[in-house]
Amino acid sequence: MVNHCDSNLIAPIVKKLAQRASVEVALNFDHGEEIGLLKKALVDGYSSVMVDASRYNLEGNIRMTREIVEFAKQFDASVEGEIGCMGASEGDNYTDDDMKTNPDEALRFAKETGIDALAISFGSSHGNYPEGYVPEFDFERLKEIKEKTKMPLVLHGGSGSGDENIKRCVEFGINKICLLYTSPSPRDCS
């Protein structure tokens, strides 16, 4: 949103288009890293926000996410939080076991923030994977987090994860799968 269009310009357009849709449409602000921008998106009419405070320690992540959860209540908007470190498919940030979500921390995070959905890290990465590469997901970790939190779980970095991985994610408890981490530039759309 920030790089492409101000939320007070895009929200009314999308809401108007959503009224014409035959299915429910959510206007989601994904990977909000700044409290001010997240609050602005909610004020401007976004129906959900994803708080990405995973760069902070657990306490900082809880604090920021809880603040947005409390703020979002007045708009009846949903809030997704993220715990664990999502890798990147390029550069030196490949997913490693120590970057995956800790199930006990996931439970604490969910309880202390009051989020509606939880994005977890269990082997996926943002961005496009190298050709022919299929990530290895830790389905036992996913299962344990689902059993502990008993809440909707989110997979970020679903693009290129492979059909079998996606099917198993749903079987093991993923409720939302995010594809395409970044928007294409206008020149890519022609």
Each model region followed by its residue ranges:
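Catalytic alpha/beta core domains of metabolic enzymes, predominantly
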Residues: 117-167
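Short, acidic/turn-prone active-site loops that include or flank metal/cofactor-
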Residues: 1-2, 54-56, 180
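Hydrophobic faces of well-ordered beta-strands that scaffold small-molecule active sites
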Residues: 25-29, 49-51, 79-81, 118-120, ...
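Single conserved hydrophobic/aromatic residue that forms the stacking wall/gate
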Residues: 181-190
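Active-site cofactor/substrate anionic-group-binding motifs, chiefly glycine-
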Residues: 1-37
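Short, surface-exposed connector motifs at secondary-structure boundaries
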Residues: 19-24, 147-152, 171-173
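Alpha/beta enzyme core
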Residues: 16-20, 34-51, 55, 66, ...
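Catalytic cores of alpha/beta
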Residues: 36-40, 160-172
